[in-house]
Amino acid sequence: MGKSWALLTHLHSVAGPSITLLYPLYASVCAMESPSKVDDEQWLAYWILYSFITLLEMVAEPVLYWIPVWYPVKLLFVAWLALPQFKGASFIYDKVVREQLRKYRGRNRNGDADHKVHILKAEADHGRVH
């Protein structure tokens, strides 16, 4: 188990930054240069979710230290978010983040009107108004 664990740890140290940062950075630049808005949405959703995961990790670091499978599980999850075959970031954004945003907007009817207009305009620009 010792050598296997060392190999897995080394693989994570190489694959982790490649999957979580290098490929998404490259794909984000390509998306910005393409005329399609769909890929822009995928990569913006990825960076929103990746930032959230990173913030959670910072807060929960003392607990995560004692969970040895956390980093391999995180790597698999972030790969699912990033890889174009799955489009996981768009899926999670649509099913979780956007729904929570709508609930929040529904509760704050008397909130900042400019903020609501900005969100509705962004949704309309991406063809998401239902």
From Swiss-Prot:
TM ranges: 5-25, 42-62, 63-83
Induction: By abscisic acid (ABA), cycloheximide, and by drought or cold stresses.
Topological relation to the membrane, as annotated: Multi-pass membrane protein
Keyword terms: Membrane, Stress response, Transmembrane, Transmembrane helix
Disulphide linkage map: none
InterPro entries referenced in this protein's UniProt entry, alphabetically: TB2_DP1_HVA22
Tissue specificity comment: Expressed in aleurone tissue and embryo.
One Gene Ontology cellular component annotation held by this UniProt entry: endoplasmic reticulum
A Pfam family matched in the record: TB2_DP1_HVA22
Protein's cellular compartments: Membrane
Family the UniProt entry places it in: Belongs to the DP1 family.
Protein's name according to its UniProt entry: Protein HVA22
Species per Swiss-Prot/TrEMBL record: Hordeum vulgare (Barley)
